[in-house]
């Protein structure tokens, strides 16, 4: 925010410096702030996942994680919805100021939580002493990393995560243009239809989480979600199917798949690993996921520019044929289905209990 206000001018200086590494000081400080925010966002995601697993293990774990995912989707969509209107009405720095205020609110909420968590730790410690057992919480050890990496369940969950999300998030980046070019949907509403998966995840993830808590079937649900993803991308890849209603129905199905897999996948990590290794496991999974979310959009962008230019728009920018990218997404979705099958097989072999309910009676 400071970079966009106090350092906004072309002649702005910081400690008498006008340029840093060839960039205007304001631009460089904005880069630095955004980078720090990115690191903090990942740390927060890992920490929140670990906290929820700690508080709700053996209880409504999938429901709690589903609510957390839903709230995250609300935040993401709200950011997209209000940023441009705020910038137009009050200036380009206003959305950043709003983000700063929300982050301060989050920090206050964390301090309140820390007090509550300390109380829970004391209760858990007292219960462990009374039961004659040791608390599962331990300090970080590199041995934990080794134990995680040699666990087949880790690699299957991590691969499923990166393959599944690589078929969803990169696709959403150009879904609006696909709606307009292939299906003839008006550009004023194309973005709304492209946002249906996020809306579906917001509503359905807690619902599916509640089902998993009571009935189980996590491995089967991940298998079902991956199969639905294949159907969606395969039909999108067929050139002759270009009716607008088909596109909308496929977006709704994608939203259901986008709810099924996360509602089962993230709580499954808490069944595969003890609490003492959960934070490390989530961190490693997020790390692998981000490699895919960097690599797949890069690949799709290269394919579009190299093989898929179909013409020019009135403003001179390229128009694209998305058949090849959709075939790539279909192939990745097929790989996610194979991994989901292997995970279900591993569940039977290693006794992860993924098919059992989360709520322990």
What would you call each of these model-derived segments?
Residues 1-23, 227-241:
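C-terminal ends and interior cores of transmembrane alpha-helices
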Residues 94-113, 323-342:
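Symmetry-related core transmembrane helices of the 12-TM Major Facilitator Superfamily/SLC fold
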Residues 218-265:
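C-terminal transmembrane helical hairpin of 12-TM major facilitator-type secondary transporters
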Residues 121-157, 359-361:
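Juxtamembrane intracellular "pre-TM" segments in multi-pass secondary transporters
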Residues 62-88, 286-297:
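Glycine-rich segments within core transmembrane alpha-helices of 12-TM secondary carriers
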Residues 27, 33-71:
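Cytoplasmic helix-loop-helix junction between adjacent transmembrane helices
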Residues 204-217, 304:
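Helix-to-loop junctions at the C-terminal end of transmembrane segments
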Residues 151-205, 262, 296-297:
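Extracytoplasmic gate region of multi-pass secondary transporters
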